[in-house]
Amino acid sequence: MLRIGYGFDVHQFGGCRPLTIGGVSIPCMKGIKAHSDGDVMMHSLIDALLGAACCGDIGSMFPDTDAKYNNIDSRKLLRIAWEKITMQGFLLENIDITVILQIPKINTYIYQMKHHLSQDLNCSVTSINIKATTTDTLGYIGRSEGIACIAVVLLTR
């Protein structure tokens, strides 16, 4: 059985948290506003995985009203969600992620992001695709007010 999941997340710049994408700390003049570490890649991926497995969403599993998730490393959340999904017999086929941001450029960090995901999900880096794009200065992302991420996953059981 094939199961497809889709996840989306967005965070606003302007907070005091460092910019973390895919578990990688990226130098940026702007911080992120968030309850956890604000990692849009991890959050959209968790939502995609949970969706494919019909296990709800990140907000239900890790509510931002719970103080224990304040400042938490989103890689930890990913590992918890993935354990729940694999306990149901799901296997990961592939991941496709698009990070949408005007600044900063992240191409030099993509290999490290893929490595983190492959470690956390116990899969090959060849099952993970990560790319970045801009909005050509349009909208809140184009004005460098925030970043977004879309993740699509394919699971089998």
Swiss-Prot record:
EC number of the protein: 4.6.1.12
One term of GO molecular function: metal ion binding
User: Could you say which enzyme class this protein belongs to?
Assistant: lyase
| The protein, known as | 2-C-methyl-D-erythritol 2,4-cyclodiphosphate synthase
Which domain of life does this protein belong to? Answer: Bacteria
Pathway in which the depicted protein is active: Isoprenoid biosynthesis; isopentenyl diphosphate biosynthesis via DXP pathway; isopentenyl diphosphate from 1-deoxy-D-xylulose 5-phosphate: step 4/6
How is its cofactor bound, per UniProt? Binds 1 divalent metal cation per subunit.
Q: Keywords, A to Z?
A: Isoprene biosynthesis, Lyase, Metal-binding
The species this protein was found in: Blochmanniella pennsylvanica (strain BPEN)
Describe its partners and assembly state. Homotrimer.
